[in-house]
Amino acid sequence: MAKRLGLDPYIVDTLMRDLIAHDRSQSAFVVFLWLWRQTHAQGRDKIGASLADIAHATGLSKSSVQNAIRRLSRRRLIGASKAGPTVAPIYQVNETWKR
């Protein structure tokens, strides 16, 4: 049996409409949900994942994931850090609406 995933109402009520309708970026919402699931819903603060990992997990192209990561970072919805040029980035989902 699959585990239930409880989403913060802000994610569905506000962020979804903002990213999809206003920014016209469905891929950013999909990537945000995947990163949120891999971190907060799993009780972790951060996750290391390559663009290829995220693309494979979400069904998006690598370029769509790259654009989504760029958009989410610019909006400060996620943070990304790299230890080196060949190391997968470490992502952190920022719940900025909870401040």
Language-model-detected regions and their locations in the chain:
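Short recognition helix of helix-turn-helix/winged-helix DNA-binding domains
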Residues: M1-A57, T86
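Winged-helix/helix-turn-helix nucleic-acid-interaction surface
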Residues: S61-R99
